[in-house]
Amino acid sequence: LPAKIGGELAGVYSMRDLADADAMADEFQEGRRTLIIGGGYIGLEAAAVATKKGVNVTLVEMADRILQRVAAPQTSDYFRAAHTAQGVDIREGVGLDHLIECDGRVGSAKLSDGSEIEIDFAIVGVGILPASELAEAAGITEENGIKVDEFGRTSAPNVYAAGDCASLPYKG
């Protein structure tokens, strides 16, 4: 998270590995408030752990729905219902504008919809956007990433894509 929007404040954590999870463990106390930025699997898992520890969770996802890049709408619906049933406030189509300092650490967050919420800590679990510029320049079909079939084949002969840049077909 860039420093100009509060990423350097105490109480702001990025979630990439187990060491990151360990670094924020003391924040998970009953009655505290957190903002989770990102509605992918990382953000949703952080929300599940936080609510089990009694933390009040607001989760923002800039996309129109949680898990938009990685799952079918039905999967998003399932996880949304499961998390909201546990008290998670999920706000889709809403991102973070900036974090606000209070007494030397994060104290509130201004969101892209103009609302402001008080928080005790923030978790950044935004993942990455697919790097598909080369495919685009080559005229390869893109659909939420580089479109591939079940074998990883793209629209170009003898060109394959895999990993976060690939968009796999949904076979409901």
Task: Name what the model sees in each region.
Residues L1-L35, S108-E116, F121-V126, P130, ...:
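FAD-binding core/adjacent interface of flavoenzyme oxidoreductases
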Residues Y13, T58-V60, R91, I123, ...:
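Hydrophobic/aromatic beta-strand patches that form the interior of the parallel beta-sheet core
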Residues R33, Y41-I100:
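Rossmann-like dinucleotide-binding cores of NAD(P)H-dependent redox enzymes
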Residues G38-G43, G114, D120, G163:
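Conserved phosphate-binding and hydrolysis motifs of nucleotide-dependent enzymes
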Residues G125-V126, A137-A138, N158, A162-C165:
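Short, well-ordered coil/turn residues at beta-beta hairpins
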Residues V148, A162-G172:
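A conserved FAD-binding loop/helix module that cradles the flavin
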Residues D149-Y160:
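FAD-binding beta-loop-beta segment adjacent to the flavin cofactor pocket
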